[in-house]
């Protein structure tokens, strides 16, 4: 359960103010159909994050060296710095609205999440924990915790949250994970 909760907390905080959260607001505003938008976010996220967690776990299994574990730890620390850089999403994102809210959201979310902070975090969590389903389920829940309120509250939510503070908290969590990994490497049991 620790892996699930760590993954959930880390991604829920990192997602606040992220470009995919801004995309959720944009799609909710454009379609005005919250249930299909939320279903599309869930479908895209579980597919994307299951692949990301699997990739991280597989890479870690192939490269079981200490150097790879140091690279993962360094990756968490770099994620801390990256989290402090605010995201933007173009208002001109071309969403195939003729396909309907669910399909358009699923496609848009899946591709916008590629290379995003939360996807990279999911890869790193998969590499660290080797628990694909716990990581994917946790990161997906984290995405839903951040994005479902964004779909319903949209701009009101963004206006009331200090994104700078949230980004600092997320950066601190990534930093702690990286330092913890380094500590585990230097103090083997």
Feature names for model-found ranges:
Residues 1-16, 88-112, 135-137, 141, ...:
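Small-residue-enriched transmembrane helix starts and helix-helix packing motifs
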Residues 10, 52, 80-83, 108, ...:
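Structural signal for membrane-spanning alpha-helices in multi-pass inner-membrane proteins
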């Amino acid at each position: 359960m620790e892996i699930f909760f760590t993954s959930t907390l880390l991604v829920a905080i990192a997602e606040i103010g992220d470009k995919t959260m801004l995309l959720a607001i944009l799609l909710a505003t454009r379609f005005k159909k919250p249930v299909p938008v939320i279903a599309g976010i869930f479908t895209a996220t579980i597919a994307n994050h299951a692949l990301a967690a699997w990739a991280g776990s597989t890479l870690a299994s192939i490269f079981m060296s200490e150097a790879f574990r140091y690279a993962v730890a360094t990756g968490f620390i770099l994620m801390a710095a990256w989290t402090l850089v605010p995201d933007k999403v173009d208002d001109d994102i071309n969403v195939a609205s003729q396909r309907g809210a669910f399909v358009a959201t699923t496609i848009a979310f899946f591709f916008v999440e590629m290379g995003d902070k939360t996807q990279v975090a999911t890869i790193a969590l998969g590499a660290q924990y080797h628990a694909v389903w716990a990581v994917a389920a946790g990161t997906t829940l984290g995405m839903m915790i951040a994005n479902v309120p964004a779909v319903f509250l949209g701009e009101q939510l963004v206006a009331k949250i200090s994104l700078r503070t949230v980004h600092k908290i997320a950066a601190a969590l990534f930093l702690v994970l990286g330092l913890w990994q380094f500590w585990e490497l230097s103090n083997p049991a």
